[in-house]
């Protein structure tokens, strides 16, 4: 072999060896989950429920967890279910008289207290818990909280394996996390991923700052624990965002600090109490920030103040932007309900607000969150008609009865949308305009005057009441 060819040969060998060393180094840097799984698995349980339903309800019931699965997998899962819980048409065609759902949970005390999701056991007539040794026990429901989707169960036992609880506040974005649960009934399945974001706000989940991860979560994982690399529970896997019905890389967990606060209250009294301001708030976007004179989008915009509520008594007004509560900044509007919800009835909330472009501080005595929301009436007015072609709406006065029903001192109702900005921003007949360009509307005449003087060089805000729900919207007039 010639010297040049020998040099090429040895160079190739050296390159292969270097690649092997790099691959080995990368493998050594990846986390080893085996010890964590061995330590944590015994405390994770499978939860199954049975619910008796009328024949008609059962005949119409779908089983979405099995829909769309490959035939062999669907058949396997149907065979593994008790005969009474199989979907319509399964087996010999017997009419189904009870339904079954599957979920996960974890033991938090040696005497048998278990955490899971409310939606896992909601409406159940019987709750069964299967432990890691495959033994099954009936569980007693201690309490539930639908607002956070947390439930506490109790099984009879002693010296049971328990999950080690961590601190979700110290969790960092990018940190490795691991889930153990029963997706589709496959007990103690392990999946891993990283924390994608913290403090996520989801629709209809006002009181939970969710942990977002890319851990694979599927039906049956709900209620199971999310672990950090120290083997500590940092969250309860609760829901996913999906367009297909299956996992798409967006999973959400309830922080364990939130869950344990709820659990401790449920164990003590069977119910959960939360602080309450009595306001309806919305996000401050770029255009709203501009219209209210803010440097950047931040805070919670007060769209509605409930009569005789804590906020009304404390002097909070529609159009105020709440920037902080007890020194804690309100970055997103969803931060406010969580901060106030953690306060006790009768405690003080020091609020920093922007009003008419100026900062000021208010002290509000926090109330107790009521069980049900307060409803406001619809609008169907018959008053004096005015129009404003600049906005593209025809408006009418509210009657005295309508003002009383809606708890309003003024405002005008939209009779017709004729085009212009009103059409672009989605205004509808029956909407009530209570504020325009940061001014309270007291009559249709004043509304027309304010509309004529609207600026064209910046965003303009408008407060609209629709079916009892108030919101601020923004628009710009064309040149």
From Swiss-Prot:
It is an enzyme of class 3 (hydrolase). Belongs to the peptidase S1C family. Substrate binds at residues 220-222, 277-281. Residues 77-99 are annotated as: Disordered. This is Probable periplasmic serine endoprotease DegP-like. PROSITE patterns: PDZ. GO terms for molecular function: serine-type endopeptidase activity. The keyword Membrane does not apply. PANTHER family: SERINE PROTEASE FAMILY S1C HTRA-RELATED, SERINE PROTEASE HTRA2, MITOCHONDRIAL. It comes from Pseudomonas savastanoi pv. phaseolicola (strain 1448A / Race 6) (Pseudomonas syringae pv. phaseolicola (strain 1448A / Race 6)). Residues 266-357, 363-468 form the PDZ domain. Its EC number is 3.4.21.107. Residues 1-27 form the signal peptide. Pfam families: PDZ_2 (PF13180), Trypsin_2 (PF13365). The keyword Repeat applies. InterPro entries: PDZ, PDZ_sf, Pept_S1C_Do, Peptidase_S1_PA, Peptidase_S1C. It is found in: Periplasm. The active site is at 119 (charge relay system), 149 (charge relay system), 222 (charge relay system). Keywords: Hydrolase, Periplasm, Protease, Repeat, Serine protease, Signal, Stress response. GO terms for cellular component: periplasmic space. Might be efficient in the degradation of transiently denatured and unfolded proteins which accumulate in the periplasm following stress conditions. It comes from the Bacteria. GO terms for biological process: proteolysis. It catalyses: Acts on substrates that are at least partially unfolded. The cleavage site P1 residue is normally between a pair of hydrophobic residues, such as Val-|-Val.
